[in-house]
């Protein structure tokens, strides 16, 4: 399995914000978001091949009881289901962070953190028009999102760049044809720097208050800035 990095930090996003966690970041992604904050795991994937026992040994070096399987897109990694099972067999709480473009296929986890991508994620022309078409065709898979929501404890987390994005989100939720509690929908300001996030935080928080969604910050930027291993 190609692993970009394994590190111990504080969960900075979502309903488990503040929880000490070991992050296992797989390398490789089937999308190319233009604002991606981990291009070394997506646009230009890099990493080392590691076996499941090697990954588990590194996880066990840390005192945390929460593990986050992230990427890139962890659901396209070979042996991801076996890794998830092995992590949970050791008694860890496992969160899988995914864009929800790949069906769960029975994978085990304690929290599915689903982050479907909006129109604002469309890549620029760095990789030419082919990737833009691939990204747009794949970024929103309502049947896949529905399978995750119906089968797992979940949170739906959307990256918001402008107020109009909220209307797009509400349209996506409507197309799921499910009763999604608003407190399980998290809106997060787009930005790879603290300044960018703060610039969007105040109006997004007000939108969350008005619509009943949950606001989520990017605590890791407050604590560590935009750097790897955090």
Regions found by a protein language model. Give the residues of each.
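Canonical Radical SAM [4Fe-4S] cluster-binding loop centered on the CxxxCxxC motif
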Residues: 1-54
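The start of beta-strands in P-loop NTPase/AAA+ ATPase cores
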Residues: 20, 65-66, 92, 110
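Short aromatic/hydrophobic contact patches that present stacked aromatics
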Residues: 23, 66-68, 155-157
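A secondary-structure boundary/capping signal
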Residues: 25, 70-71, 98
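Structured loop/turn residues at beta-strand edges in well-structured enzyme cores
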Residues: 31, 62, 107
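Residues that line or immediately flank small-molecule/substrate-binding pockets and catalytic motifs
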Residues: 40, 71, 116
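Glycine/small-residue-rich loop that forms an oxyanion/phosphate-binding "nest" at active or ligand-binding sites
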Residues: 45-72, 76-78
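Conserved AdoMet/S-adenosylmethionine-binding subsite of the radical SAM
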Residues: 56, 75-230
